[in-house]
A protein has these predicted regions:
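Short, charged/polar "capping" segments at the starts of alpha-helices
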Residues: 21-25, 48-54, 130-131
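N-proximal low-complexity "stem/linker" segments adjacent to membrane-targeting elements
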Residues: 1-27
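A conserved mid-domain beta-alpha-beta active-site/ligand-binding segment of alpha/beta enzyme cores
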Residues: 136
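Acidic metal-phosphate-binding loop of nucleotide-sugar-dependent transferases
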Residues: 95-97
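Active-site-proximal specificity loops/subdomain of glycosyltransferases
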Residues: 44-88, 101
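Conserved donor-nucleotide/metal-binding helix-loop-beta segment in metal-dependent transferases, i.e.
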Residues: 99-131
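Short, acidic, metal-binding catalytic loop of nucleotide-sugar glycosyltransferases
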Residues: 29-40
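Catalytic metal- and UDP-sugar-binding loop of GT-A-like glycosyltransferases, i.e.
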Residues: 91
Length: 136
């Protein structure tokens, strides 16, 4: 996976949503195109299609009928298991980009993805993990 011209990467960017949060796709797509690139393809994973247009670099994939929160992870897992790509970037519609993407940091991350001894499960690119209190 490489960063191409216009800050486009050749791996899927998948953004999860649900019917109750479709309106968040408006600010999400605007901020994504502002701070990443309007040339970067993005796939929205949801249930009902939005009733408004998305930017041309965004596509919508329905996960079927929204059956409730208890089935959400199952629906996402089914989609991901059918994905042919080795790598993907996954996020949610309520995690907005709020400043330009640091592509030098992204290049460093991509190097880690390519090392044989690095088994990556998750990297949090936002502040929520470090700023929110956790109780377990």
């Amino acid at each position: 996976m490489k960063i191409k011209k216009n800050n486009v990467i050749d791996c899927p960017i998948l953004i999860a949503t649900s019917d109750g949060y479709l309106d968040l796709l408006k600010p999400f797509s605007y901020l994504f195109n502002e701070f990443w690139s309007a040339k970067q393809p993005v796939t929205i994973l949801g249930y009902k299609s939005p009733t408004f247009g998305l930017p041309s670099n965004f596509t919508f994939e329905s996960l079927g009928e929204q059956r409730g929160i208890q089935f959400w992870a199952e629906d996402i897992k089914k989609y991901l298991c059918d994905l042919k790509d080795e790598y993907f970037i996954y996020s949610a519609e309520d995690l907005f980009l709020t400043r330009p993407v640091n592509f030098e940091s992204l290049k460093t991350l991509l190097k880690f993805w390519h090392t044989e001894d690095f088994n990556l499960a998750r990297i949090g690119l936002g502040n929520t993990v470090k700023n929110e209190a956790h109780t377990h």
